[in-house]
C-alpha cells in the first residue's frame, strides 16, 4: 500500500480566513487544484488565485441561504474514496479524488459569547457541512490530509516540498487527531450551550428552573495538554498540565516563561493562588505564597516597598515561595529578591529588561510574565470527587466600602476601614478556616486551614510574635462567621481592635455584644469566602 499520496486537489472552506490566501497560493505554486465554497472562493478569486466553486464542480447550487453547500456525493465520495479500492466506483460517477481538506468551523463560541445573542443566532452558527467534511477526511487519513489549524499551514507546505508534494502517514494521522479534537470540542460547546439553555428558554417564568438551567445536563470539557511533567503533587504521581483554548484573562495558564526550570505541578498551583490574590488589589501589591496559602501580603507606594513589607510578615515561610506582583517587575525589586531569599517563581504583568538581567544570575528561578488585566472574567471552578465533579461559579465577588455594615457601637476610622477591606481581600485566598491580622495594608499574621477558627487565630498570633510584629491595634478578618463569642474574646486579649466577618450566625448578637464589651469595631460583609 502506498503510504504517501501526492496532493493534486484540495478543498478549502474556512470561517477564519487568516493565512488562507498565502496557503492557497502556496498550494497552487505546487500544482494543486483548488475547490472552494462561498466566501472562501470569493476571497481566493479576488486575490487572483485559480479556484473552482464547489457548486460548479457538483452541478448543484448552494441553497437554503448557505445551509447546503458541500453535502454532495461528489464531495464526500472524493474525500472518503479509498485509493486502490474505490477507484472504479469513483470513475463510474465522475468523482475526482480530494487529497486535502482545509476547513475550520463557524464561530459558534464567539457568537454565543455576545450579550445580545439569540437562540436563532446560535442555531444559524451551527456548522453542518464543515464537521462532516472534517470527519470524513480524518476517517480517510490513510489517503487524505485534513487541516483545521491555520498554524499548520507553513509546516505542511514545507513537508510537501520535502516529500514530492505529499505528506507522510504520520503527519496525516497527527492532523486527523487534531481534526477529531476540533469537532469534539465544537460539538461539546453546542451541547453545553443548549444544555444550559433548555430550561430558561422553555420555562422563563420559573425562576428556580432558570437557575438550574445555568448548568448543562451533560458537561463536556475540552482542555489541551500544554506540558508533561516529571511528576505530580508527589513524586509517585504522574501528571500533566492542560489549558483551555482562547483564554483572554491574564493567568498562569497563559503566562510566558522568560527563564528557569520547567514549572512543576506544585509551582503551577501555587503561582495560580499568588496571581489570583494579587489581582485583587489596585494599589502596588505583593503576594508571597507557600503551599497555595498567602504567607505575606502588602501594599506599598511601589512594588519594592510592597515586597519588603510582605516578606516581613513571615520570612521563614517565604523561603522557597512564589512571589506575585500587580505591577512591572523592576530592577530594584528583582535585586532585593535575589539578594535576600530563595524563590521558586516570580510572576508579574511585565518584566523590565534590567530586572530580567538581574534574575538571570539565578538560572533556576522561574520568571513568568502574564500580561496586564482588567476586570475578572466569570468562569467555572471544578473540584474532582471520586466518581463525580463539583462545579460552581468561580468566587470573583468582593465587597467595597458601600457594602459594609458596621454593627458595633464604635465606628471605624478611615485607616481602619482601609485595613479591614485589605484584610478581607487576603482572607478570601487563605484556606479555611482563615484568620488574617493586618495593619496599615500589611499582613501581620495569617492562620490557615485549621478545623477550629479559634486555633487559626492562635496561629496568626504566634506567627506575628515569632517575627516580632505587634498585633496590638491590628484588624482581623475571618472568612466565615464566628459561631461563638470566644473568637472575639481571644482577639481582644491580643490587642485586635477591629473585626470583619460575614455574619449570619444564630449567635450574631452575642458576638456583637462581645465586640462592644471590648470596645472593638465590628463590620459585617454578608458574604462568605470559604476556600477548601
Swiss-Prot record:
Residues 1-148 form the MGS-like domain. InterPro entries: AICAR_Tfase_dup_dom_sf, Cytidine_deaminase-like, MGS-like_dom, MGS-like_dom_sf, PurH-like. The keyword Chaperone does not apply. It catalyses: (6R)-10-formyltetrahydrofolate + 5-amino-1-(5-phospho-beta-D-ribosyl)imidazole-4-carboxamide = 5-formamido-1-(5-phospho-D-ribosyl)imidazole-4-carboxamide + (6S)-5,6,7,8-tetrahydrofolate; IMP + H2O = 5-formamido-1-(5-phospho-D-ribosyl)imidazole-4-carboxamide. The keyword Signal does not apply. HAMAP family: PurH. This is Bifunctional purine biosynthesis protein PurH. It comes from Histophilus somni (strain 2336) (Haemophilus somnus). The gene is purH.
